[in-house]
Amino acid sequence: MARRRRPEKREILPDPKYGDVVLSKFMNSVMLDGKKSVAERILYSALDSIEARVKRVPLEVFHEALDNVKPGIEVRSRRVGGATYQVPVEVRPDRAQALAIRWLIAASRARSEHSMSARLSGELLDAANNRGNAVKKREDTHRMAEANRAFSHYRW
């Protein structure tokens, strides 16, 4: 572990089409085996199909979906005197964003549509409307934290 200083955060360039940094992070998470052009094609085609289906700006739908999936609180394991407690802690904004991106992509990959772009657009639309597996994951996380509220004094 570094003793001296925290490494500075890397600057992520905004995506070429919409000029959005969060969308660029999402694209990097969709990417497999370093194939960014494939990830770009999947994401942009998903956003185009969202625009065709709901007649709204796809970037607004994307950010709405992301906000609906971001967790506010999560549980972390804390060992106290031989027992392990699930302690509820608040989620930092950067971690909340990373978790939301991860959950949206995992939920998309688990869907049954034919292409990844169709699965991604479906999951983003569901999340924007507070439905879908990614939103369910967030609600499960919040429910778990609520159930373990008694251990919140073990926070660190």
Swiss-Prot record:
Q: Which UniProt keywords apply?
A: Ribonucleoprotein, Ribosomal protein, RNA-binding, rRNA-binding, tRNA-binding
GO BP terms in the entry:
translation
Keyword Ribonucleoprotein on entry: yes
Q: Which CDD domains match?
A: uS7_Bacteria
As for family, the record states: Belongs to the universal ribosomal protein uS7 family.
Role description: One of the primary rRNA binding proteins, it binds directly to 16S rRNA where it nucleates assembly of the head domain of the 30S subunit. Is located at the subunit interface close to the decoding center, probably blocks exit of the E-site tRNA.
What's the subunit arrangement here? Part of the 30S ribosomal subunit. Contacts proteins S9 and S11.
Q: What is this protein called?
A: Small ribosomal subunit protein uS7
Q: Which organism is it from?
A: Zymomonas mobilis subsp. mobilis (strain ATCC 31821 / ZM4 / CP4)
